[in-house]
Amino acid sequence: MLMLLTFFAEHMTPLNVFRYITFRTGGAMITSALIVFLFGPSIINSLRVRQGKGQPIRADGPQTHFKKAGTPTMGGLMIMTGILVSCLLWANLASVYVWVVLLVTVGFGAIGFYDDYLKVTKQSDKGFSGKARLGIEFLIAAVAAFVIMRAGQEPFSSSLTFPFAKQFVVNLSWFFIPFAAFVMVGAGNAVNLTDGLDGLAIVPVMVAAASFGFIAYLSGNAIFADYLQIHFVPGTGELAVVLGAVIGAGLGFLWFNAPPAAIFMGDTGSLALGGMLGTVAVATKHEIVLAIIGGLFVVEALSVIIQVGSFKLTGKRVFLMAPIHHHFEKKGWTESQVVIRFWIVAIILAMIGLSTLKLR
């Protein structure tokens, strides 16, 4: 919306600053952070009153988690509010990529909200039907993938690129839609599985958002894209503004989610943020790089798949508890040790992922 001020730049030169993605990214970050900081306490109090007992605690979980009983969930509402308001102010709303990413965020967030609602009202960790939930997620993601493919430039709009072999490109044709949908849904649910300890998910999400904000800016700039030999995708640079809003909202949320958490992100936030990251990766043609930068989320998801698969096939569990962060708690790590060490892993993986931009 503030981009409209550039129409008056001819008479007021300082307004030209709103043309710069970097300036608007910073503005979006500050705005979303302030929104969450200022309105967070009232939202938390309202959710605490409405939810009563708060998010149910897993009976088979670590004993230290029972003291968290009564903590409200659906903190993702705070995050999404900050992101949406900030993007409406600072992003170029003429960009189809901005709208696609925001619609996936809201769509996945709505699914997560309904899941959280069922868990709170039933006081059970069994929420929305898994099959129905995945079905709706794939439907939303498939629509988003179709729009991204049609908005791109042929033949690269339906292609898959590889970070360490930049000249090797696979044209997926119409198979791009189910592939892209899988990336979005997988990212959403991987972040969802990671969100199990105070502050555990939000920092790696911010690290990934910062990394992909950088990637989006480079991918949307013809000069930088040519220099780095990555695919130039016109318009994706605007996604840096959206991801700046994610970082700001994440910082605001972390203020309240730091241990002991005053509120949990819930599926409302984790599904929305994961789906957003997956959509950005698809739009910028860096799906495989997402698996590196978001490697922590991948490991968390794989630990659940391995645990469930092993138990069904052999009757034995590979981990003491899944997702894997609970395994380390059962091994004797304190919650703070798990969280901070996982943050470190996320930062290292992000640096490795970003290094692929230069490696040929």
Swiss-Prot record:
Q: Which CDD domains match?
A: GT_MraY
EC number(s) on file: 2.7.8.13
As recorded in UniProt, coiled-coil segments are none
Q: In which pathway does it act?
A: Cell wall biogenesis; peptidoglycan biosynthesis
In the record, biological process GO terms are: cell division; cell wall organization; peptidoglycan biosynthetic process; regulation of cell shape
The cofactors required by this protein are: Mg(2+)
What sort of enzyme, by top EC class, is this?
Answer: transferase
Catalysed reactions, semicolon-separated:
UDP-N-acetyl-alpha-D-muramoyl-L-alanyl-gamma-D-glutamyl-meso-2,6-diaminopimeloyl-D-alanyl-D-alanine + di-trans,octa-cis-undecaprenyl phosphate = di-trans,octa-cis-undecaprenyl diphospho-N-acetyl-alpha-D-muramoyl-L-alanyl-D-glutamyl-meso-2,6-diaminopimeloyl-D-alanyl-D-alanine + UMP
GO MF, any single term: metal ion binding
UniProt subcellular location = Cell inner membrane
The reply to whether Transferase figures as a keyword in the UniProt entry is yes
Q: Which residues form the signal peptide?
A: none
What the protein does?
Catalyzes the initial step of the lipid cycle reactions in the biosynthesis of the cell wall peptidoglycan: transfers peptidoglycan precursor phospho-MurNAc-pentapeptide from UDP-MurNAc-pentapeptide onto the lipid carrier undecaprenyl phosphate, yielding undecaprenyl-pyrophosphoryl-MurNAc-pentapeptide, known as lipid I.
HAMAP family listed in its UniProt record: MraY (MF_00038)
- The protein's name: Phospho-N-acetylmuramoyl-pentapeptide-transferase
The source organism is Brucella anthropi (strain ATCC 49188 / DSM 6882 / CCUG 24695 / JCM 21032 / LMG 3331 / NBRC 15819 / NCTC 12168 / Alc 37)
